[in-house]
Amino acid sequence: MEFLVRTENLLPNDTPEELRDELRKGERERAMELREQGILKRLWRVPGRNATIGLYEADDPAALHDALVSLPMWKWMDVRVEALATHPQEKQQRLS
């Protein structure tokens, strides 16, 4: 299944810089692992916000949840997930 995942970083402004750097590093490393596992397909930044939009692929919502909670910044994220279904036009293009 494919999922569109919108995340916004809600890390408090008074978080020590050392902790911020550690979390960012861990987040990058974990994202690369998810890419290597074929779970994280694409990732975009949202201009003007501390937010991302990602295209994820997982067997089911529970597997996606497991991937998301493995992110070091999970507890400071506002996460919105939309399950995606293939549009009929996409199905037709694949057959052509």
Give short role names for the model-derived ranges.
Residues M1-S96:
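Conserved, structured core segments of small domains
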